[in-house]
């Protein structure tokens, strides 16, 4: 199952805003009983200006945009049950989306793109780990961003014979 990582988004708190009301409570004797006079609405004001609200809105929008840009496709190297597999083994990403391959177990793994199963013009050595380089510990990662649309076949060099292969599509 794929996981998506993202940046933390902080949403501003409005707990500092206070309602300003008259400190002197009005009683029936201080309220005009005249039905012909128009009553003024109560004087309520927020101790925050429109400018402050605008700054908060812009900051919130910027946080959301930055968090969206920080999203990445996460692929586990090794399943939770110990199987030698990429999880997911087939997936699709957008052109320019970051892909994070994460070692899910203590087995040594790597990510090598098959030069015969990538779009023409793409250099497999520039997007692959070296076949002798390994992610040895759980949590270690390898990141790649693919910009050329097409299908990409990849494998784990130490476990390719055991069927640890995958395929991704860049749209």
UniProtKB/Swiss-Prot annotation:
Can you list the disulfide-bonded cysteine pairs?
Answer: none
Q: Where in the cell? A: Plastid, Chloroplast thylakoid membrane
Which residues are noted in the entry as Cu cation-binding?
109, 156, 159, 164
Output the Gene Ontology terms for molecular function: copper ion binding; electron transfer activity
* Function in brief: Participates in electron transfer between P700 and the cytochrome b6-f complex in photosystem I. Seems to be a minor plastocyanin in Arabidopsis.
Q: Which UniProt keywords apply?
A: Chloroplast, Copper, Electron transport, Membrane, Metal-binding, Plastid, Thylakoid, Transit peptide, Transport
User: One GO CC term of this entry?
Assistant: thylakoid
Query: Principal localization?
Result: plastid
Q: What InterPro entries would the database entry show?
A: BlueCu_1 (IPR000923), BlueCu_1_BS (IPR028871), Copper_blue_Plastocyanin (IPR001235), Cupredoxin (IPR008972), Plastocyanin (IPR002387)
**Pfam families, sorted:** Copper-bind
Q: Which family does it belong to?
A: Belongs to the plastocyanin family.
How this chain sits in the membrane, per its record, is: Peripheral membrane protein
What protein name applies here? Answer: Plastocyanin minor isoform, chloroplastic
Where is the Plastocyanin-like domain positioned along the sequence?
Answer: 73-171
For activity, the cofactor(s) needed are:
Cu(2+)
